[in-house]
């Protein structure tokens, strides 16, 4: 299978691409700056430069490709909501349309469990109502991107698959350390739970969506087996005391931040290789 990956310099992509190559896939990478992925070229990846906002620049990279794995995204900036929406919605739409025109058969898109709000009174399932006007730009931009892809699936029969990632960590990813200061900035409750997923299981889920038949137009959550409280997470880094207020009101929604992974398990046979944060910590896989 010939696969084009975007976002190869990001947290997920920089770990996913080497694993694809090690498994013998024919991998191409679309980047804006080829110098940032020279190590992947040494491993055998084909490097193409292009811009998601310039459809003509995408054509060489898409020629002969069987499937696209679209990982590129603009995450939290707190200052550039417009840029987040442009990258995550318009960039995704442009790439998908170019891929369809180029004859690509499958398009796998990484979204986020942050598309879910609160008040579901259970772990969030893929068919929950989400708010397209979510004030969080990252969340609303991912919802909009999902909608654009599903529209292409309905109108053109394009085989799109959407994977909503829980909080991704592991493989020396600094994501946890970077996020702990945000718990205080965003006034998060210490008892709030967060669902996590190790990079190994992101890879596992992406490969399942890449290779399995009969998943056209489907959306899946991916997470591990054991959500963890924000307090526990901060405490494991010695940061709990300076992150949370000593006095807190009761937690309003104990299910906020938790997702239901039963669909992915039933449809694909997915089972997390790293079932919890504590397993990863004890096995030195953080």
Task: Give residue spans per PLM region.
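Mid/C-terminal beta-alpha module of Rossmann-like enzyme folds, strongest
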Residues: 2, 205-261
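N-terminal Rossmann NAD(P)H-binding glycine-rich loop of SDR-like oxidoreductase domains
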Residues: 3-23
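NAD(P)H-binding glycine-rich loop region in Rossmannoid oxidoreductase-like domains
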Residues: 35-41, 45-89, 98, 118
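Conserved Rossmann-fold NAD(P)-dependent oxidoreductase catalytic core, especially the SDR/UDP-sugar
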Residues: 93-137
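Catalytic helix-loop patch of NAD(P)-dependent Rossmann-fold dehydrogenases
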Residues: 120-162, 188
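Glycine/proline-rich active-site loop of Rossmann-fold NAD(P)-dependent oxidoreductases
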Residues: 143, 155-158, 168-179, 208-220, ...
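NAD(P)-dependent short-chain dehydrogenase/reductase
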Residues: 151-201
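C-terminal amphipathic/interface module of NAD(P)-dependent oxidoreductases
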Residues: 242-286
């Amino acid at each position: 299978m010939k696969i084009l990956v975007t976002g190869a310099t990001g947290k997920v992509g920089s770990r996913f691409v080497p694993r694809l190559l090690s498994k013998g896939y024919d991998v191409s990478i679309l980047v804006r700056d080829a110098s940032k992925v020279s190590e992947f070229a040494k491993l055998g990846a084909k490097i193409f430069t292009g811009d998601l906002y310039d459809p003509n620049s995408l054509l060489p990279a898409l020629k002969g490709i069987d499937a696209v794995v679209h990982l590129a995204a603009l995450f939290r900036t707190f200052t550039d909501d417009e840029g987040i929406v442009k990258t995550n919605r318009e960039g995704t739409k442009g790439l998908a349309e170019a891929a369809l025109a180029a004859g690509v058969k499958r398009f796998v898109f990484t979204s986020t469990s942050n598309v879910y709000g609160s008040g579901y009174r259970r772990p969030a399932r893929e068919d929950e109502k989400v708010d397209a006007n979510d004030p969080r730009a990252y969340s609303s931009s991912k919802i909009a991107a999902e909608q654009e892809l599903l529209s292409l699936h309905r109108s053109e029969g394009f085989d799109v698959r959407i994977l909503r990632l829980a909080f991704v960590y592991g493989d020396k990813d600094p994501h946890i350390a970077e996020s702990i200061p945000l718990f205080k900035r965003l006034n998060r409750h210490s008892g709030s739970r967060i669902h996590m997923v190790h990079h190994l299981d992101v890879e596992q889920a992406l490969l399942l969506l890449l290779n399995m038949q009969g998943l056209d137009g489907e959306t899946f959550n991916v997470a591990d087996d054991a959500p963890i409280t924000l307090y526990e997470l901060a405490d494991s880094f010695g940061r709990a005391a300076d992150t949370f207020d000593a006095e807190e009101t009761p937690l309003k929604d104990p299910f906020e931040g938790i997702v239901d992974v039963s669909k992915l398990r039933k449809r694909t046979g997915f089972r997390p290789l790293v079932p919890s944060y504590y397993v990863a910590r004890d096995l030195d896989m953080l």
